């Protein structure tokens, strides 16, 4: 902790570069500009050389030290000069001015809350702000509704005690009790009239450069390898750059729908990596209880569990790991993107979507949500909706009618009608697949996928780096022509073709498996009793949020195999356990937990 007059800054460091001299806070030559920082800057060498050519004296050899000097040169626009993943606070002692900045994609979290009298408290971790006097640990009904619709709460307002997220690519400026935020970057396509070969070369160059930038480290470094095309490309490029075998790590489960060990072995053999596997056979009840110790906001993405487990294994050997996260967002790999186009075409034929969907719904209903009949029914139901509602219907967990049925009368009265997922997400910023990519980059990516990755990895002190989420890679991805996004049923066409020479043939055209766990089996087996005790118990009933008889019906339908509610039950279980752990439990004394300015 460092007291700087009206500002107090605190920091806890994971040492990755400049191990000996990279302590924080960092200052300029006079000590008038002070910075703390979470994350990594990948271009700090170039930035340092530029600053030194302008007469700045930058100490040490790492990235943090450049930040105060970049602020001196660029003022409030300083984040635009930096490339990496970061949450940064800069205190200008002379002006008594605080600047907060978050990286372009939202890889590193940054939360803040406005205090009475014009003060402000901020922190990387939400739980630090729970300790600030005056912050009420309460979940707004609208936030609960959004969570059940999407499995996460989208946007800047978390709906918890007035706490907000600083949006990705934004800077917050506090001075004399006044606050305003503004963007310093926006994900926009760059129209280019290029031949296919030129596009593919641009993809190769941007992805290769992104991987190369993320190999700078003064500690052991490896990669999380699934055998999917994204992580395989990342590991292949790492192997080309490395002088020693790359260390790779894979997690598997005894369910062929999720197990990717054999595919990962193919990639590991192809690139000569030093490979480690973990078969996930934990006590699910114990694992769920561990989740609540580090997940300080409600998140129903079950992939956080295997991410946590593989991070634990990797951290025994390395401090930094590269991942394949971002391939679907940057290069249009999600099936729902293609489904939107199909739904639009099907919807042009009157009556067909609704009739066909009802026919598919008449099939035995215990099928898995990812089964072909289930996906076909969702597609046809989507086609029958107005265009603006289609995308939300494909990504929702609890549809609005089911949420209306689920909510207790008093809670429902405080909320009003449940909002559709499309309303919660807002309209895509542009038509077509590029607009959907940008919509996901605005909501799902920073508020779900990156929350999952950051919380799970940081709980084990492992730093994850995602080259396919480099902002320059994303800019190329949203600029591609549709012919290089989808071809038939295959997505990520540009990525597949650009690196066809690198990916082993047996992996090049395989479909997406997903990084999940067998929730359906869990809620019919080892987690069934826990779920019943937690969701139907007195503590849950006393909240007055959900109708117990509807929750009981969902549990029963799932247990009998009539429906697969595994994902919905998981979201409900996480919500209740999160409220117990973070809204009800006693927390440590509040002194010194969050950085503050008054």
Regions found by a protein language model. Give the residues of each.
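Cysteine-centered catalytic environments shared across enzyme families
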Residues: 1-296, 307, 311, 500-501, ...
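Extreme N-terminus nucleophile/cap motif
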Residues: 1-13, 352, 362, 366-370, ...
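Adenosyl-5′-phosphate
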Residues: 6, 130-131, 140, 161-168, ...
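Short hydrophobic "helix-edge" motifs at membrane interfaces and signal-peptide entry regions
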Residues: 95-97, 217-219, 262, 314-315, ...
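Active-site adenylate/phosphate-handling loop in enzymes that bind or generate adenylated species
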Residues: 104, 309-367, 444, 449-473
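Glycine-rich loop motifs involved in handling phospho/adenylate chemistry
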Residues: 221-230, 255-256, 302-305, 330, ...
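Short secondary-structure boundary/capping segments
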Residues: 292-294, 335-342, 589-590
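Acceptor-substrate binding/catalytic loop of class I
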Residues: 297-301
